[in-house]
Amino acid sequence: MPRPTSTLPKAQHCRAQASDSFQKRFFRFEFVYPKAENIVYKKTPVLTDNVMHYCPGCSHGVVHKIIAEVIEEMGIQDKTIGVSPVGCSVLAYNYLDIDWAEAAHGRAPAVATGISRVHPDRYVFTYQGDGDLASIGCGEIMHACNRGENIVVIFINNAIYGMTGGQMAPTTLLGQVTATTPYGRDAKLNGFPMKLTELLAQLDGTCYVTRQSVHTPANVRKAKAAIRKAFENTRKDKGTSFVEIVSTCNSGWKVTPVEANKWMVDSLVCST
């Protein structure tokens, strides 16, 4: 069979062959396009890109993340106002891209009450530690819950004053060693641990009271569901929702993050 001839001039035909050969050698992947991304996780835009100041192993970062995810999923970023008082979370406004108000030590429920009453269409929540809420702020939280203010209270309980050096808090366990109880908490000297969640659950103004933790992926999901339910209660104007998160403080407890998680499960979770 005769070989097909090219219609190109000889010199032009040689250049075309050379060009084809060059492309085959050096551009063999030219028409291979990447597959579409299969995104399995994406940081919520409600969280800023600021580096958190919390200690490695601290529970605050995880709780910030699930709060931010709930706010995004509910589509309420521009309607949410957080209130943060004195404590490790005093800089929370650097990490969640929502409106924030700062409150004096323990006074976040009072500030949240004022904001909620002036802006009843907003989702108002406080973010407080046990040294803040259960001690100097005990009166504010008791009366806000008793009135049934339409707010969410997120209570981070690590049974110690974390920011100020690891002193005894109202929720410190009996026998627990702190900077101010070097031989362990003694009921005769220091009283018993304050079980604030159980106290608030008995008030008529609270519509939802729960205790959660974030020490395992399963518990993180449960805590997130609890926080979402609390915000949904605000949407329905049901009253005060109180979510306690039993947390770690490895720097205050003077242990490693791994040891802190184990101690929390063995001692704090089981005793609360």
Region roles according to the model:
Residues 55-56, 99-100, 128-130, 185, ...:
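A generic structural signal for short
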